[in-house]
Amino acid sequence: MEPVPAATDGGERPATPSGLSASQRRAELRRRKLLMNSEQRINRIMGFHRPGSGSEEENQTKSKPQDSDKLNSLSIPSVSKRVVLGDSVDGGGADQLGGVAEVRGTQLGDKLDSFIKAPECSSKDGAELRQRTRGDLTADPAQRASHHGLEQYLSRFEEAMKLRKQLISEKPSQEDGSTAEEFDSFRIFRLVGCALLALGVRAFVCKYLSIFAPFLTLQLAYMGLYKYFPKGEKKVKTTVLTAALLLSGIPAEVINRSMDTYSKMGEVFTDLCVYFFTFIFCHELLDYWGPEVP
């Protein structure tokens, strides 16, 4: 197959060589059409116009109405492609193409804007919903904690008011002079026993044993004898310390047990004071009356 020369700028087309079959002629014509179409596209893009292309322009103007009808039936992307390529040919067909392209371009822009705005709105709505849910999740524990703290504060305030009323009611009874009720029979027995023990220790035992060993033995005996003595009713005294402990959240049972322990320690300390004071007093009397007494 001989090489076929390309089309010149003047628009002259070389004749097809003779002696070719029908299929070869068809292929040659297709190739020439493709070359011409590519040249025309390049010239349109670059802005060149061939002077001898009047007949071709007429053919193009005739085919433009058909192209406009096809454009109306085609989709939006095909219209946009043709608008980008664009024809530099003047005439009514070009005006129609421009109008169609503008209308379709505006429609395309509106649709694209709607498609773009819809995901943005949905994303904004989703972000707002997430922020609201997060805010609700973070607000729920804070509200619960504040509600719990408020309830605790109110309960403690009520307890403080009750303790205040109890303190006010107990003060007149203490001022009336009913202190004799505090000393029961067992308490008096303890004090008398400590004084007698101090006398006996000073008279007979101080040479051989420590003065505190008999006292500890007596306290152990008191712990066993406490069961056999009648128990008087103990009035629970409400003090500022107990009120403060209750308001701080310590249970009342723990406070009562601690108060009982402190009262027992106070009794033991009182017994020790009586015992030691009696012992020293006896010792001074013996030294004053008889210097020879050991």
UniProtKB/Swiss-Prot annotation:
Residues 1-75 are annotated as: Disordered. Disruption phenotype: Conditional knockout in B cells results in significant reduction in the number of mature follicular B cells with normal cellular proliferation but increased cellular turnover. Residues 1-187, 230-267 are cytoplasmic. It holds the Pfam family Get2_like. Residues 59-70 have a biased composition (Basic and acidic residues). Keywords: Disulfide bond, Endoplasmic reticulum, ER-Golgi transport, Membrane, Phosphoprotein, Transmembrane, Transmembrane helix, Transport. GO terms for molecular function: ubiquitin protein ligase binding. Component of the Golgi to ER traffic (GET) complex, which is composed of GET1/WRB, CAMLG/GET2 and GET3/TRC40. Within the complex, GET1 and CAMLG form a heterotetramer which is stabilized by phosphatidylinositol binding and which binds to the GET3 homodimer. Interacts (via C-terminus) with GET1. Interacts (via N-terminus) with GET3. GET3 shows a higher affinity for CAMLG than for GET1. Interacts (via N-terminus) with TNFRSF13B/TACI (via C-terminus). This is Guided entry of tail-anchored proteins factor CAMLG. It comes from Mus musculus. The gene is Camlg.
